[in-house]
Amino acid sequence: MFAEYGVLNYWTYLVGAIFIVLVPGPNTLFVLKNSVSSGMKGGYLAACGVFIGDAVLMFLAWAGVATLIKTTPILFNIVRYLGAFYLLYLGSKILYATLKGKNNEAKSDEPQYGAIFKRALILSLTNPKAILFYVSFFVQFIDVNAPHTGISFFILATTLELVSFCYLSFLIISGAFVTQYIRTKKKLAKVGNSLIGLMFVGFAARLATLQS
């Protein structure tokens, strides 16, 4: 399938993409958290931020920016530390709000929804490993002798985004159902928020220690 467009072993790629999307990461965790705290609208706004951020990174990977980042340690480190700092900021903010007893059932006005989208977008864009991954993974399924490898890259990128959309939709719908349950279980909600905050801090530490 899509061999005429320079895509190799598409079905193998699809299976690989599914497994990759299922691996827990800060993006999926952020979407799940917002679907629980802000409902389906908050979850899908977070997902939109992730989709757009990923699309930008995929385009940069195709444009050759990934090679520049990989061969320029200082550039890689700048993006890496920015990403780690932002993850630490999000984790600390969640932990602080939980410890102070702030209730996530607070008003869900438009500025809050806008902030969710922006945070998700920044979270996605400040992951230098993602852009390097897209190159190393996609190149295995692209015929370098094809006349238009950009089309091949687009097909693979679109497939990954569609798989991600399906999985994040599942998380968002599940999170919305969980919201109805934890509204009457405040202690459980606090424990859940604390764990999410700690996981973001853990992701920050892992990103800060990654090498290009």
From Swiss-Prot:
GO (cellular component) term, any one: plasma membrane
Catalysed reactions listed for this entry: L-leucine(in) + H(+)(out) = L-leucine(out) + H(+)(in)
InterPro entries documented for this protein: LeuE-type
Bilayer topology annotation: Multi-pass membrane protein
Main location: membrane
Any one Gene Ontology molecular-function term assigned to this protein's record: antiporter activity
Matching Pfam families: LysE
Subcellular location: Cell inner membrane
GO terms for biological process, alphabetical: L-leucine transport
Keywords associated with the record: Amino-acid transport, Antiport, Cell inner membrane, Cell membrane, Membrane, Transmembrane, Transmembrane helix, Transport
UniProt key word Cell inner membrane: yes
Stretches that traverse the bilayer: 12-32, 49-69, 71-91, 122-142, 153-173, 188-208
Function: Exporter of leucine.
Family: Belongs to the Rht family.
NCBIfam families to which the protein is assigned, alphabetical: PRK10958.1
Protein name: Leucine efflux protein
UniProt lineage: Bacteria, Pseudomonadati, Pseudomonadota, Gammaproteobacteria, Enterobacterales
